[in-house]
């Protein structure tokens, strides 16, 4: 089990959507998320080329499947870090469990402590995010 280290105090924040963009209200600031900033500043040439190559329908199917798999992985790994049991008996759940177990074996085995899970972090006046 990974121990929670109470070194930092985190300020709570509220996530909200504004015109399709993720934002946070935290410590009196209304801030764009890191995801929103990266989305607006990235070069999406490769992505557009990939969609053209795959076709819109197939690209959307792959994007959706990847997002669902990522959410499942996040849930499994978050519960592991928090020392909670979690089991998803669906086919996808069993697939992501095997993937998550590899991440735990290789990436989390040497980790003995963590400072926060799904906490809001921000830089006053610039951006916020949850990690």
Locations of the language-model features?
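Metal-dependent nuclease catalytic cores that hydrolyze phosphodiester bonds in DNA/RNA
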Residues: 1-129
């Amino acid at each position: 089990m990974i121990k929670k280290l109470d070194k930092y105090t985190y300020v709570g924040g509220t996530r909200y959507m504004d015109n399709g963009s993720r934002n946070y209200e935290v410590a009196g600031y209304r801030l764009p998320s890191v995801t929103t900033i990266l989305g607006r500043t990235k070069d999406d040439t490769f992505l557009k080329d990939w969609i053209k190559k795959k076709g819109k329908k197939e690209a959307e199917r792959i994007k959706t499947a990847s997002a669902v798999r990522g959410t499942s992985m996040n849930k499994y790994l978050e519960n592991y870090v928090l020392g909670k049991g979690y089991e998803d008996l669906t086919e996808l759940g069993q697939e992501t469990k095997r993937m998550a177990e590899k991440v735990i074996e290789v990436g989390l085995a040497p980790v003995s402590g963590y400072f926060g899970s799904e906490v809001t972090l921000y830089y006053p006046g610039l951006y916020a995010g949850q990690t």
